[in-house]
């Protein structure tokens, strides 16, 4: 080969350029545009199978589940507002039903905006704040079913608390039910309504200063501390809800609370624990640390949150079906068609306005956290039971004047609940 090259040099330059240059690799290398193009192709080929969340299939499938759940739940909310005959119950029922639209739509928007900027933090904050609202609303709905604190205390006051490791009452051995127990249940759920919005605001602030990254358990990252506070707060709230159900499950039996209780706890617990599982998988390296989405680098924590949002989009359809059976509107429709309606019908707009107003939560928080907490009285207005109510106790409504029924006003049986003795406080 060396002899051939020497011969070509002596024979003349044109022959060298004609025969030697084509097979040599150096002239093919200096193409400037080839480098970046190949890099993009490689990134796309490597990232495409891993980034299912940004594909049209993932967004389409999640969208179908979300909009189906929205239609089903929207129709159920409308049915309750059309038969808004028990405001003090249905107000909380509708609040519970709104968990599906808020969870589903927020998760879908977070999935659509998955990328380098963690927009999902803002949507998840709204979703998580409503989670606290749901826990409180369910507990208060159970209070309304039973007629309030005074009516509950009339049934359980002085009874010993059964020790059970399954129900988490093993540490309450030798204690009996008192108003302090009910107050603890209320305070434990109300504290979550306060802690969660505060932690959501802190998360947004830390995110703005680049001090918050999902899945980053470093002591210098805000994620660790936000997660610890959130887990402690939600665990306390759910524990209080569980204790209340354990104490009143016999009283709540006519209202079929098991499906209601399991559905609400499944929605909250499932999203909570699957989020924790994804964070652990991300920490263990199962979820890759960095992916590329359209040239944008996405952290593993953001990717784990994307999987969480996709799962929630799918799960909300099944949640909407479960809530449809747990809180049917037919019970109140029968009451509407009875000869003696329990309360004057309200318009859909006024019923919706009453439902979304947080005024009752603020008042309840002030009352239960006040140092001057005293005997709690509650006046319940019970309607004369009409046909088609299935033997259930009539729900309580706002107390009306005790002047009887006259001038076209419907008859009401106003029962003043007894004062809870001060020694129970």
UniProtKB/Swiss-Prot annotation:
Belongs to the TMEM184 family. GO terms for molecular function: heparin binding. It comes from the Eukaryota. This is Transmembrane protein 184A. Acts as a heparin receptor in vascular cells. May be involved in vesicle transport in exocrine cells and Sertoli cells. The chain crosses the membrane at residues 51-71, 96-116, 133-153, 189-209, 226-246, 261-281, 303-323. Residues 375-425 are annotated as: Disordered. It holds the Pfam family Solute_trans_a. It is found in: Cell membrane; Cytoplasm, Perinuclear region; Cytoplasmic vesicle membrane; Early endosome membrane. Its main location: membrane. Residues 392-402 have a biased composition (Low complexity). PANTHER family: ORGANIC SOLUTE TRANSPORTER-RELATED. Expressed in testis, pancreas, parotid salivary gland and mammary gland (at protein level). One of its GO terms (biological process) is regulation of protein localization. GO terms for cellular component: cytoplasmic vesicle membrane; early endosome membrane; endosome; perinuclear region of cytoplasm; plasma membrane; secretory granule membrane; transport vesicle membrane. Keywords: Cell membrane, Cytoplasm, Cytoplasmic vesicle, Endosome, Membrane, Transmembrane, Transmembrane helix. It is a multi-pass membrane protein.
């Amino acid at each position: 080969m060396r002899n051939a090259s020497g011969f070509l040099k002596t024979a003349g330059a044109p022959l060298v350029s004609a025969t030697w240059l084509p097979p040599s690799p150096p002239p093919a290398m200096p193409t400037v545009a080839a480098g970046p193009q190949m890099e993009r192709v490689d990134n796309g080929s490597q990232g495409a199978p891993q980034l299912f969340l940004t594909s049209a299939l993932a967004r389409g499938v999640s969208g179908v589940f979300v909009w189906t759940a929205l239609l089903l739940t929207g129709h159920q909310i409308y049915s309750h507002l059309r038969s808004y005959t028990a405001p003090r119950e249905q107000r909380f029922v509708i609040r519970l039903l709104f968990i599906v639209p808020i969870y589903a739509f927020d998760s879908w928007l977070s999935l659509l905006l998955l990328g380098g900027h963690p927009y999902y933090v803002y949507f998840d904050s709204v979703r998580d704040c409503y989670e606290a609202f749901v826990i409180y609303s369910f507990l208060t709905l159970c209070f309304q079913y039973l007629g309030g604190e005074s009516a509950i205390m009339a049934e359980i006051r002085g009874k010993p608390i059964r020790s059970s490791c399954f129900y988490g009452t093993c540490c309450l051995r030798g204690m009996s039910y008192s108003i302090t127990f009910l107050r603890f249940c209320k305070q434990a759920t109300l504290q979550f309504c306060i802690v969660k919005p505060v932690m959501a605001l802190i998360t947004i602030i830390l995110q703005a200063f680049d001090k918050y990254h999902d899945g980053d358990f470093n002591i210098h990252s805000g994620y660790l501390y936000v997660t610890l506070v959130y887990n402690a707060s939600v665990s306390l709230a759910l524990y209080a809800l569980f204790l209340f159900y354990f104490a009143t499950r016999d009283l709540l039996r006519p209202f079929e609370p098991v499906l209601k209780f399991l559905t609400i706890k499944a929605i909250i617990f499932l999203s909570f624990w699957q989020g924790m599982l994804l964070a652990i998988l991300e920490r263990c390296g199962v979820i890759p640390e960095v992916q590329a989405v359209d040239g944008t680098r996405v952290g593993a924590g953001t990717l784990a949150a994307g999987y969480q949002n996709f799962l929630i989009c799918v799960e909300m359809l099944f949640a909407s079906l479960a809530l449809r059976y747990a809180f049917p509107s037919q019970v109140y429709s029968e009451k509407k068609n009875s000869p003696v309606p329990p309360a004057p019908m309200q318009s859909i707009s006024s019923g919706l306005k009453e439902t979304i107003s947080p005024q009752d939560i603020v008042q309840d928080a002030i009352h239960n956290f006040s140092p001057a907490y005293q005997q709690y009285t509650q006046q319940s207005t019970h309607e004369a039971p009409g046909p088609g109510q299935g033997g259930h106790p009539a729900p309580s409504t706002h107390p009306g004047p005790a002047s009887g029924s006259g001038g076209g006003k419907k008859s009401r049986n106003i029962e003043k609940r007894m004062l809870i003795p001060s020694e129970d406080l």
